[in-house]
């Protein structure tokens, strides 16, 4: 992580919670969000004696930065005494110091409203030789208040004109005036009125408003990608100017550095768009170390038809850092995508948002055109996330090839990369298991059967299979037929079917034979017992009386 100075906050108790007869009290000072260690905390107790204790630094989970607390215990006439906590962070700067002055306890109070007003231009719209900035501090509970002016974050050593405090009812107000030369005001610096009150800081800032860009013309600066910065080691920044009207004049793009050091040679490209406008691109190689250390680069655009130059600047993103979490997986097969498979990669909880995503096939980087990645989006917390999607062919996944999703980010350690591998198995959905041997004969079975081997070629229907459009590996509705293949050799359930068929055949033959024998036996029995009567009857029938 890059060097980060601490934020300092006073820690006090509510006055109503401190006994009136207390002989000693404890107050604290919190320094948080700094990197690296250490910080040095000292106290100014005035005329009182006190003992201090600084707790060991703790690591903040999300950013990896540090926080520590220093405690001061004082005795004596502490109620009327102001105390100053002084925090120094040498890694940020040898002279970096933040002072917080506050009392032992906090009373209920109304905080002040801080607002900066500036003098207006003359009748011609021009700034006067001197500019007055007026800081109005109003609406606060009467009490000690301190006003300081800052220029680009640094305390200004100037004589200030501060009015006396006026009180209206239960609230008070005051004001402070700062006079600047026109040169300082036009230098694009930021001026801040900082008010310290009851151990808290309130402020308002102002600067000369940027001139509006010429209508229709826009300029943009892009930072180097993490891939170019940390992998290729050849970072570049790009200045893009769009919506220029073609003319005989020349568009000039000039690069510079805030440090005043020379810049590298840039490349330039002009392209005429379909709407008749001109787009100009200038690409500048930058030093990896210069960029990481926070150098600021500026692109200045001039053209005879522009009323004023356009200025754009870029530098390394500030703020906390967090390494990305990478998850790669294969999506389940879908009925309409038989010849391809989709791999997905979720990358989340990283800061800042600058990230590069690549896919590798058997450790060889794939072209960017083969995959698509979303723009970084904010999470519910303070981090960002992206999704990346890659389509692979059947031939690639049937060879058990390995695919790697790699994220390049400055907070990833030790090499600024985090990667996860995923392999697709034609035998198992999502698959990381080894694929099985492909069978070679085709049978048709109901989709209600489970655990059947896959159809020839994975999910492509076999020419001899006419039992439906489903696939053996797809867990579809039971009423759907699926095409599956029989493994080499005879399947166990084939012999079972033959045995059942033979048993049923023999049973039916036995049943028919038994019925036939029974009928023959009954017929013979009836013949032996009733022969005379039967003959008489037949005689009577054949020879009727005349």
Curated annotation (Swiss-Prot):
It comes from Homo sapiens (Human). GO terms for cellular component: extracellular region; extracellular space; IgE B cell receptor complex; IgE immunoglobulin complex; immunoglobulin complex, circulating; plasma membrane. This is Immunoglobulin heavy constant epsilon. Residues 1-499 are extracellular. The basic structural unit of both sIgE and mIgE molecules consists of two identical heavy chains and two identical light chains; disulfide-linked. N-terminal variable regions of the heavy and light chains form the antigen binding sites, whereas the C-terminal constant regions of the heavy chains interact with immune receptors to mediate effector functions. The chain crosses the membrane at residues 500-520. One of its GO terms (biological process) is type 2 immune response. It comes from the Eukaryota. Pfam families: C1-set (PF07654). Residues 6-103, 112-210, 214-318, 324-423 form the Ig-like domain. The lineage of its organism: Eukaryota, Metazoa, Chordata, Craniata, Vertebrata.
